[in-house]
Protein backbone atom coordinates (compact mmCIF):
# COMPACT_ATOMS: atom_id res chain seq x y z
CA UNK A 1 0.00 0.00 0.00
CA UNK A 2 1.38 3.38 -0.91
CA UNK A 3 1.63 6.16 1.60
CA UNK A 4 -1.09 8.78 1.34
CA UNK A 5 -0.24 12.38 1.97
CA UNK A 6 -2.41 13.90 4.63
CA UNK A 7 -3.39 17.49 4.00
CA UNK A 8 -3.55 19.96 6.85
CA UNK A 9 -7.09 21.07 5.98
CA UNK A 10 -9.92 20.36 3.57
CA UNK A 11 -9.14 23.48 1.63
CA UNK A 12 -5.55 22.34 0.94
CA UNK A 13 -6.77 18.91 -0.16
CA UNK A 14 -9.31 20.50 -2.51
CA UNK A 15 -6.76 22.94 -3.95
CA UNK A 16 -4.15 20.26 -4.56
CA UNK A 17 -6.69 17.95 -6.26
CA UNK A 18 -6.15 15.17 -3.71
CA UNK A 19 -9.89 14.70 -3.10
CA UNK A 20 -10.61 14.33 -6.84
CA UNK A 21 -7.82 11.76 -7.27
CA UNK A 22 -9.10 9.65 -4.38
CA UNK A 23 -12.68 9.79 -5.65
CA UNK A 24 -11.59 8.76 -9.16
CA UNK A 25 -9.53 5.89 -7.74
CA UNK A 26 -12.49 4.59 -5.71
CA UNK A 27 -14.81 4.98 -8.70
CA UNK A 28 -12.47 2.92 -10.92
CA UNK A 29 -12.22 0.20 -8.28
CA UNK A 30 -15.99 -0.03 -7.90
CA UNK A 31 -16.48 -0.12 -11.70
CA UNK A 32 -13.98 -2.98 -12.00
CA UNK A 33 -15.80 -4.91 -9.28
CA UNK A 34 -19.13 -4.35 -11.04
CA UNK A 35 -17.70 -5.58 -14.35
CA UNK A 36 -16.26 -8.70 -12.71
CA UNK A 37 -19.47 -9.61 -10.89
CA UNK A 38 -21.84 -8.80 -13.74
CA UNK A 39 -24.37 -11.53 -14.39
CA UNK A 40 -25.00 -12.88 -17.89
CA UNK A 41 -27.33 -10.74 -19.98
CA UNK A 42 -30.95 -11.23 -19.05
CA UNK A 43 -33.80 -11.94 -21.42
CA UNK A 44 -35.80 -8.85 -22.31
CA UNK A 45 -38.91 -8.28 -20.23
CA UNK A 46 -42.07 -7.89 -22.28
CA UNK A 47 -44.59 -5.49 -20.82
CA UNK A 48 -48.08 -6.04 -22.14
CA UNK A 49 -50.04 -2.98 -23.13
CA UNK A 50 -53.54 -2.92 -21.66
CA UNK A 51 -54.90 -1.02 -24.65
CA UNK A 52 -54.48 -4.08 -26.89
CA UNK A 53 -57.28 -6.64 -26.68
CA UNK A 54 -56.28 -9.78 -24.87
CA UNK A 55 -57.78 -13.19 -25.43
CA UNK A 56 -61.44 -13.91 -24.75
CA UNK A 57 -62.48 -13.88 -21.09
CA UNK A 58 -62.61 -17.27 -19.40
CA UNK A 59 -65.98 -18.98 -19.53
CA UNK A 60 -67.83 -19.68 -16.31
CA UNK A 61 -70.21 -22.59 -16.16
CA UNK A 62 -72.83 -22.95 -13.47
CA UNK A 63 -73.49 -26.61 -12.83
CA UNK A 64 -76.68 -27.97 -11.27
CA UNK A 65 -76.75 -30.65 -8.63
CA UNK A 66 -78.03 -34.02 -9.69
CA UNK A 67 -81.67 -34.72 -8.95
CA UNK A 68 -82.70 -37.47 -6.58
CA UNK A 69 -85.94 -39.37 -7.29
CA UNK A 70 -86.80 -36.94 -10.04
CA UNK A 71 -87.03 -34.00 -7.62
CA UNK A 72 -84.53 -31.19 -7.59
CA UNK A 73 -82.86 -30.95 -4.21
CA UNK A 74 -83.82 -27.90 -2.23
CA UNK A 75 -81.82 -26.29 0.55
CA UNK A 76 -84.47 -27.35 3.08
CA UNK A 77 -84.42 -31.02 2.14
CA UNK A 78 -82.39 -33.23 4.49
CA UNK A 79 -80.74 -36.45 3.47
CA UNK A 80 -81.15 -37.75 7.05
CA UNK A 81 -84.36 -39.55 7.96
CA UNK A 82 -86.58 -37.56 10.31
CA UNK A 83 -86.35 -38.73 13.92
CA UNK A 84 -89.62 -40.02 15.32
CA UNK A 85 -91.33 -37.55 17.63
CA UNK A 86 -91.19 -38.76 21.22
CA UNK A 87 -94.00 -38.28 23.66
CA UNK A 88 -93.60 -36.23 26.82
CA UNK A 89 -93.57 -39.35 28.98
CA UNK A 90 -90.77 -40.91 26.91
CA UNK A 91 -88.66 -37.75 27.10
CA UNK A 92 -89.16 -37.46 30.88
CA UNK A 93 -88.21 -41.12 31.33
CA UNK A 94 -85.01 -40.67 29.30
CA UNK A 95 -84.17 -37.51 31.24
CA UNK A 96 -84.68 -39.24 34.60
CA UNK A 97 -82.54 -42.17 33.46
CA UNK A 98 -79.70 -39.89 32.33
CA UNK A 99 -79.94 -37.79 35.50
CA UNK A 100 -79.74 -40.91 37.66
CA UNK A 101 -76.73 -42.14 35.70
CA UNK A 102 -74.90 -38.78 35.94
CA UNK A 103 -75.93 -37.30 39.29
CA UNK A 104 -77.06 -40.38 41.18
CA UNK A 105 -80.64 -39.17 41.71
CA UNK A 106 -83.64 -39.63 39.46
CA UNK A 107 -85.54 -36.40 40.07
CA UNK A 108 -84.63 -32.79 40.78
CA UNK A 109 -87.11 -32.71 43.71
CA UNK A 110 -84.82 -34.95 45.77
CA UNK A 111 -82.10 -32.32 45.58
CA UNK A 112 -84.38 -29.53 46.80
CA UNK A 113 -85.78 -31.53 49.74
CA UNK A 114 -82.42 -31.46 51.57
CA UNK A 115 -82.42 -29.20 54.61
CA UNK A 116 -80.42 -26.00 54.40
CA UNK A 117 -77.97 -27.23 57.06
CA UNK A 118 -76.85 -30.18 54.89
CA UNK A 119 -76.02 -28.01 51.91
CA UNK A 120 -72.41 -26.91 51.65
CA UNK A 121 -71.84 -23.44 53.00
CA UNK A 122 -69.57 -21.94 50.39
CA UNK A 123 -70.23 -18.32 51.28
CA UNK A 124 -69.22 -18.79 54.92
CA UNK A 125 -65.92 -20.40 53.89
CA UNK A 126 -64.97 -17.40 51.78
CA UNK A 127 -65.64 -15.01 54.66
CA UNK A 128 -63.53 -17.15 57.03
CA UNK A 129 -60.62 -17.11 54.60
CA UNK A 130 -60.82 -13.34 54.27
CA UNK A 131 -60.71 -12.91 58.05
CA UNK A 132 -57.57 -15.06 58.35
CA UNK A 133 -55.54 -12.74 56.12
CA UNK A 134 -53.46 -10.58 58.43
CA UNK A 135 -51.72 -8.44 55.87
CA UNK A 136 -49.88 -5.41 57.18
CA UNK A 137 -50.46 -2.52 54.83
CA UNK A 138 -48.03 -0.09 56.41
CA UNK A 139 -44.52 -1.36 55.72
CA UNK A 140 -41.62 -0.77 58.03
CA UNK A 141 -38.09 -0.03 57.01
CA UNK A 142 -35.22 -2.50 57.63
CA UNK A 143 -34.32 -0.75 60.86
CA UNK A 144 -37.90 -0.76 62.19
CA UNK A 145 -38.59 2.84 61.18
CA UNK A 146 -41.94 3.84 59.71
CA UNK A 147 -40.87 3.16 56.14
CA UNK A 148 -42.70 5.28 53.62
CA UNK A 149 -44.37 7.46 56.23
CA UNK A 150 -41.08 8.91 57.29
CA UNK A 151 -41.21 12.67 57.67
CA UNK A 152 -38.54 14.63 55.86
UniProtKB/Swiss-Prot annotation:
Organism domain of life: Eukaryota
Pfam families with a match to the protein in the record: SUZ, SUZ-C
Region of interest (Disordered), ranges: 28-152
Domain SUZ: 42-107
Record field: compositional bias (Basic and acidic residues): 89-100, 113-130
InterPro entries in the cross-refs: SUZ, SUZ-C, SZRD1
Boundaries of every SUZ-C domain copy: 111-152
Annotated disulfide bonds: none
Signal sequence region: none
Coiled-coil ranges per UniProt: none
Family as reported in the entry's similarity comment: Belongs to the SZRD1 family.
Annotated protein name in UniProt: SUZ RNA-binding domain-containing
Taxonomic lineage: Eukaryota, Metazoa, Chordata, Craniata, Vertebrata
Gene: szrd1
Amino acid sequence: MEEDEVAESWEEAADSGEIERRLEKKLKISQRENNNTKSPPRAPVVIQDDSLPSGPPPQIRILKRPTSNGLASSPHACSRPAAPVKSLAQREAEYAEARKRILGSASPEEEQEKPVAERPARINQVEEIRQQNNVIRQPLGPDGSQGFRQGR
